[in-house]
Amino acid sequence: MESRLIGWDIGGAHLKAVLVNDLGDILSAKQTPCPLWQGLDRLDAELDLLTDTLGLTQYTHHAITMTGELADNFENREQGVMAITDLMARRFGTERVRVFAGHSGFLMADHVSKANVPEIASANWLASGLWGATRLEQALFIDIGSTTTDLLPIRAHRVENRGYTDHERMRYDELLYTGVARTPAMTVARRVPLNGGWINVMAEHFATTADVYRLTGELPEHADQLPAADNGAKNIAGSQKRLARLVGLDVDALSEGGWRQLAASLREHQLSAIHASIQLQLSRGLLDDSAPLLG
């Protein structure tokens, strides 16, 4: 029987899976919402769904990265890593489950211990970076997701990160907690231009960046898989209403074009912050002008 491998990225909000055959050909790629902070049973339920959808068998091998250990239903990252690893091993068998542990490679599930937690926790960025380094001599790796942005220089086929843990990477602007769907819009800008003046943005979770990019026309609907900030409609009208609350207005205070301009302003604030962090990485002098962006 053909050997298959599935790669799982177990996040705090989404579960991602890519199934490949023994030649490395991608057979299927899936992403499903998985609010892990609501309990491990949510992960179990989504694994049930994808196991059936992808036709996984007892012969399928499983490779795992994770960021879900940060979910606040876990006491700490150690508990999260061990709980997620145990669940996957219980479901699919310890002999067929490998967990990515950074430069230590993939560990068999029953070899994962507390000592490995710092290498395993939130290391999916490194898995991507190491793969990219096998293909390109130099590049700036950038991954903008629903919640975070990763930046990582690659030079001489080596990743050149200064931080490893989330805390360290945030210190060096290699990890930015800003993304295109789940980021609260209030965190993107302190104030925005409106009707010829400046208006401070309310520090309330009224809207997300999904609303911003929906109004700019750049958000594929499949990218917004979790409920809106108000649990309301995920359409143009719903996004306008949520952005209106952010600046203390009702939706009829501006035209559709006015709300689109507000969204464009928030977009520019977010992109400016990402651009500044890119400039910081480039200022290290590791890459020459021919280095491509890898994303």
Regions found by a protein language model. Give the residues of each.
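Nucleotide/phosphate-binding catalytic cleft detector across ATP-hydrolyzing
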Residues: M1-G12, V18-I142, L152-L294
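Conserved Rossmann-like nucleotide-cofactor binding loop
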Residues: A13, T147
